[in-house]
Amino acid sequence: MSDNSAAVLSNNLIYSAMIFYTLAFFAHAVEVAWSVKTPANSVKKTKLDFSRTDRIGRLASAFMVLGFLLLLPGVIFRGVSANRVPWGNMYEFSITGALAFSAAYLFALKKYKLRWLGLPVALSVLLTLGTAVTLLYRPSAPLMPALKSPWLVIHVSAAIISGGVFLLANCIAATYLMIDRYEQKGLRPVWAEKLPSLEALDNLSYRLVALVFPLWTFSVIAGAIWAEAAWGRYWGWDPKETWAFITWVAYAAYLHARVTIGWRGRKAAWLCLLAGSTFLFNYIYVNVWGTGRHTYSGL
């Protein structure tokens, strides 16, 4: 297969994946709408209502799986077209990041039954891919000299996986805060009838961050080792390095507050979102508009 054919195939697969993520988004939206229309505690709720809502939810999950199964080879063939790993510019970071976020959700869907997160996850993946193919797209090209290193695979893969799980934990923390706002008034929103308790949401967000924080730590260390090999110094307070460290400190503070101080609930959720915002700032602003040796966006 020629490089051009691989590039075309990659583009087609990514567009096809977007179709299924769009279908998943609308199916999840219908599932939520039907749940709101007939609350779980309603005496008028029938077995047919439960069955109908469950079927559309299962269909939405199937669309999410199909989207992932198309996006995965789309990312792979992008690398084939460039004869390298597909992590050389913001377009490639974005499609791979969407893949990692989707994979983290599907893993959590299987292990923790998180179908209720499908709506925001599908929307986030769609927005990321839509931005990638419309604003960030660049033809396949060789890597910059500084990126030609085995550390690219080690460092970037760890960062992408960490980011996908961090963002999933942030979605759960945001859901916690939305429900908590209602429950402070003695209410529980209709759309949250089937969701886990606040305590379960709080614990799940914490478990995801605790699970992936060591990998993020490894990513930061691997980046420093790579910097020494490429530029002759381990740390130079480049904007990208600085914000990666800030993200590490923020999530470390979150874990410390949970384990040592005993923070739970609202305060922990806000701290989790704050940590996630530092990651997104680094990923979006620093990559696109930042200056320094880590400016690889290709824009």
Roles of regions detected by a PLM:
Residues 1-299:
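Polytopic transmembrane helical bundles with strong interfacial aromatic enrichment
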